[in-house]
Amino acid sequence: MYVILLDNNRTNILANPVQREILYCIRCGACLNVCPVYKNIGGHSYGTTYSVPIGSVITPNMNGLEEYKHLSYASSLCGACTEVCPVKINIHGLLLDNRHASVEQGMTTFSEKMAWKIWKLASLKRGLMNTGNGTLKSKVVNKLFKDWNKYHTPLEFSKKTFNEQWKERKHE
């Protein structure tokens, strides 16, 4: 008689006090039913055995964070999955933990880091956010986030800024 034990990196997950929680998953699918990302794009686009959102936590831990880190970014972090989970897994918290781990392990490119710094600066300074039209912003941002666009549709900005749209509505 032979006994084959298939671990699939579960021992390493069990050793991590934060990520251990994902092993409690009973694969009931409650998180899938409430996930807005899953509702819009389905599970096949993720290309893994475990579907989102719990699969976005499990897969990088089982099959390697470097190859599957993008799954942790495929979430709106609304928290609906955590609310409905019958075993109370903090799914959106674990997604954030995976994102943090990928940054800490240096898995982000220089251009990605710079793009987020520019985005932060523009978000903090309203004048910068209003500079340029939507077409120009779309081209610049999509160029900066070209790695992001491997897994997502390119970003497309509105032709008018939020402030312009707000002023138009205010005068109506």
Language-model features: locations:
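Short linear elements at protein peripheries
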Residues: 136-172
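Phosphate-binding glycine-rich loops and their immediate beta-loop-alpha structural context
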Residues: 25, 29-32
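Ferredoxin-type iron-sulfur electron-transfer modules in oxidoreductases and energy-metabolism complexes
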Residues: 1-22, 38-141
